[in-house]
Amino acid sequence: DLNLKIFDLTHEIPPYNIWEGAYRLYQTASYWPQGSVFVSVVDPGVGTDRKSVVLKTKNGQYFVSPDNGTLTLVAQTLGIDSVREIDEKANRLKGSEKSYTFHGRDVYAYTGARLASGAITFEQVGPELPAKVVELSYQKAKATKGEVKGNIPILDIQYGNVWSNISDELLNQAGIKLNDTLCVTISEGSQQKYAGKMPYVASFGDVPEGQPMVYLNSLLNVSVALNMDNFAQKHQVASGADWNIDVKKCAK
């Protein structure tokens, strides 16, 4: 179909990192229109009995992926309309039946292209499954008086800024305002990796060079940075389902 538009969102997901694949889908999906078909293949279980599915979200988008946790965040934020298992007898690249390790090409890209072009309908993808997907466990963002807690899903890797899943709405619910002094604690599982004080400011230039700060990133989520330095590298902070952050008001 010469009218079909194909966009590469990224080929930079670290190998086997299902969590980062899940976050990048969440980060980008809302900018695309109803009817968009996303193909996401982070598939360390390729060739095993994990299911290959197409998720239709409540806003009318389609996500073609292994059902291994990749769909966690789009399912939670966009809502599940329905899920279908890919019928590989009907929706698999012809001649690839003996290939067990390249389902990205043989199953997912093939099915996604056929669905996006109208060669098949959503109903022709395969049998309908219960309206749920495999979900990764992580710290959901929450607010109490003077304090917010959440997960560190991703790093702004070029600059070493630490992004959380804590929204500006939750910050407001906690009563945290610009120029408040905040105590920030970052942990990997039960192990504390960082604890320190810093101001909540609008932008990087509001603190001296090399100093820490809390700010809102482009998604309007709570983030931590060093002005013109690399916070994640300096403090050995990473991201993922096991990385958590606690931010609360404290004395200067």
Task: List the predicted regions and their residue ranges.
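Generic structural signal for buried aliphatic residues
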Residues: F38, L182-V184, M213, A241-D246
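Anionic-ligand-binding alpha/beta catalytic cores of soluble enzymes and soluble regulatory domains
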Residues: K94-L178
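Intrinsically disordered, low-complexity, positively charged segments
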Residues: D1-P15, A22-Y26, D156-N161, I166-L170, ...
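Pepsin/retropepsin-fold aspartyl endopeptidases
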Residues: M228-N230, K234-K252
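A structural signal for short, hydrophobic beta-strand segments that form beta-sheets
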Residues: I80-S82, N151-I157, Y200
